[in-house]
């Protein structure tokens, strides 16, 4: 997904195979979009484009953007008919207005929410809609706390490593309203998310949390991964799978005329 401020390194094939729940769980927010035939829809942080393809299958004319060239290349391989490109969501400007802007599991990678809101507003026609879901307040709090504690125990300062923006409803609604949107729906909810198999936590840390480990030796990283697993196991492991403590923020908004 688009990560305009993160140094996270994306492995597109691994993402598709081991973190495929990201797009699979996007069905609910996609149903809120209700794309119509002929509509122009921009997908911000499209990743490997599974949801972009579903929007296009409804008859919409889609454009998908993501900061990661690896993700775009993987999406283009899977869906060569789609218009996908590597773009920064902070600076992207559309040549033609869109009827809708969509985003799933991406906006929490973009700490400058105001810059993203400017992009969304500039992309939409008046009356156009914005539908998004991403990490909300206290998303993956247990994973983050365990990681930060373990980094500290191994002599690493955890400050400044967290790459994510997890706002409350009020915080994010205020951003959208400041940029000319009328918020029509805002939900914050828990979504406990199973991670694949015995290596689920390690795979998640490898794919999602590079920023925490940019200066950590391979030896320390292996020990930290094991310690994080051990800390999470009592409360976040069921029936052979680790459970990530996801909390999501879902919003719908309409761009108001100036």
Where are these regions (language model features)?
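C-terminal helical/coil "lid" or tail adjacent to the Rossmann-like core of SAM-dependent
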Residues: 184-239
